[in-house]
């Protein structure tokens, strides 16, 4: 089922106490009107699950392409247990969209494997701004929420 048919921000299941864990969130500044609500959604979920605000570290990068390096910097920090990458790439008239989406998805995967830590892909890849807004707190939920839930669930597997 595609996310166009379902709001995926609701979930079920227990998440154990992870209040001692530290979460890094790297946020792309490009398309800030989209990425900021993604960030707010992710933080709200982490706080709701008992993660202290002091255990949430934010790093901004200029664009989605830079998320991989920002994630690596956070993953290298002593004490960071998981990293959430938040960005938005909107299809334009050129192939730039394809190159950025491909590079960032591979880059984030490589950081996951290199540091053996959850590095979560919270990047919207949409055809237009309306689709992006729909997934940044709109009718299809907030993918920032979902990225935080994924980080929590992945860390829960380590205890």
UniProtKB/Swiss-Prot annotation:
Source species of the chain: Cytophaga hutchinsonii (strain ATCC 33406 / DSM 1761 / CIP 103989 / NBRC 15051 / NCIMB 9469 / D465)
Binding-site residues for (2S)-2-hydroxy-3-oxobutyl phosphate, renumbered to this chain: 93-94, 135
Database matches in SUPFAM superfamilies: Lumazine synthase (SSF52121)
GO MF, one annotated term: 6,7-dimethyl-8-ribityllumazine synthase activity
Gene3D superfamilies: Lumazine/riboflavin synthase (3.40.50.960)
Keywords of the record: Riboflavin biosynthesis, Transferase
Gene for this chain: ribH
Binding positions for 5-amino-6-(D-ribitylamino)uracil per the UniProt entry: 30, 64-66, 88-90, 121
Protein name per Swiss-Prot or TrEMBL: 6,7-dimethyl-8-ribityllumazine synthase
Organism phylogeny: Bacteria, Pseudomonadati, Bacteroidota, Cytophagia, Cytophagales
Catalyzed reactions per annotation: (2S)-2-hydroxy-3-oxobutyl phosphate + 5-amino-6-(D-ribitylamino)uracil = 6,7-dimethyl-8-(1-D-ribityl)lumazine + phosphate + 2 H2O + H(+)
Family of this protein: Belongs to the DMRL synthase family.
HAMAP family found in the cross-reference section: Lumazine_synth
């Amino acid at each position: 089922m595609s996310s166009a048919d379902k709001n995926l921000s609701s979930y079920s299941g227990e998440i154990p106490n992870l209040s001692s864990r530290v979460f890094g969130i790297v946020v792309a500044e490009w398309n800030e009107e989209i990425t900021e609500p993604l960030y707010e959604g992710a933080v709200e979920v982490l706080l709701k699950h008992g993660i202290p605000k002091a255990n949430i570290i934010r790093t901004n990068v200029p664009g989605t392409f830079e998320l991989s390096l920002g994630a690596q910097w956070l993953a290298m920090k002593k004490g960071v247990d998981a990293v959430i990458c938040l960005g938005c790439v909107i299809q334009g008239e050129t192939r730039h969209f394809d190159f950025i989406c491909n590079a960032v998805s591979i880059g984030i995967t490589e950081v996951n494997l290199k540091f053996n830590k959850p590095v979560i892909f919270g990047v919207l890849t949409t055809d237009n701004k309306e689709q992006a807004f729909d997934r940044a707190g709109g009718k299809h939920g907030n993918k920032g929420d979902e990225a935080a839930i994924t980080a929590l669930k992945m860390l829960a597997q380590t205890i």
